[in-house]
Amino acid sequence: AFRHGLPLSMRSALYPLIGERIHGPIGHAVDVVAILGTLFGIATTLGLSVAQINAGLNYLWPSIPVASSVQVITIAAVTALALFSVVAGLDKGVKNLSILNMVLAVTLMLFVFLVGPSIFILEAFLQNTGSYLNNIVERTFNLQAYTHSDWIGNWTLFIFGWTIAWAPFVGLFIAKISRGRTIRQFVFGVMLVPTIFTFLWFSVFGDTALHLIMNEGYTTLISEVQADKAIALFKLFEHLPLTSIVSFVTVVLIVTFFVTSSDSGSLVIDSLASGGVLQTPVWQRAFWAILEGVVAAVLLIAGGLSALQTMTIVTALPFAIIMIIAMLGMWRALVIEGHRDISLLHHMQVSRYSDNSLA
């Protein structure tokens, strides 16, 4: 988009395929689908986040009940924080909150790693990474056609849909803050580093829990997590030092995780709705931040987690098709850029040869 003077929106990904027609009905339709996918993707995240925040608050202060009313109030509070960040802008609000978020996340992960079974975690990290890479193709295409299980719908398809719903806003937001970077830098900073961090995160927390169950006999952790998945992390912290402090930090971290997602998502939705304009009125950015909270609250009251999951999958399906087309557009754009670089190099060589001949 920046290189060719195009708007920073999803429609620009189709420019190598359909050219100026991205400014017509096709481009409008693509951006609308991206807006809906992002809106419901963030709303789903908020719905899941408040369930865990509510569980954490109940764990720290039992007088606070686990109830829809508390979760709706939590949605309002978190949305207010996101609204403040959006109004503050990219440099003052979003950037500072993102730095705080990463500091808390890394600190929490290092704490669990150091006080937990460190050697076991490192061994499991290497083994699980190898197992993941070995099984990724088979697991990706496994739809359990010959068995009957709710797992595939509640987890695999939901996570795929959730990821796809997040794709437009994450991609566009990272593109917005990565202007001037090379493709190599972009791939390294956006794909490689976060992937390694994700592997480490799941290994540290997941394998610490497995070590407690397998090696230290805390089998009750299994039934406690099965009874309420939202308190899984807090039940894990019961077996670690500084339980109350770590649990409080975790609640704060969950809040900042969502707020950073909501504020950046609001900026991207606002940009999409404005045709790729980077600077928009404050009230317009605030509108999208508030709407995300309203959608999350309505879906949570109407149908709980199942309603959130259903809307995520429904909105992600059409965008999955757009993503495939966008990948073809990216491939064609790189091919064109490659030919352009070769032509430029050839022109420079010819010019240099001509200058030497004249000399």
Task: Label each PLM-derived region with a short phrase.
Residues 30-34, 38, 44, 54, ...:
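Membrane-interface loop-to-helix entry segments
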Residues 7-25, 49-73, 105-108, 172-181, ...:
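Helix-loop-helix connectors at the membrane interface of multi-pass transporters/channels
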Residues 1-2, 38-46, 70-78, 82-85, ...:
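Hydrophobic, membrane-embedded alpha-helices of multi-pass small-molecule transporters
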Residues 43-61, 73, 106-143, 205-210, ...:
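Hydrophobic alpha-helical segments and their helix-loop junctions in multi-pass secondary transporters
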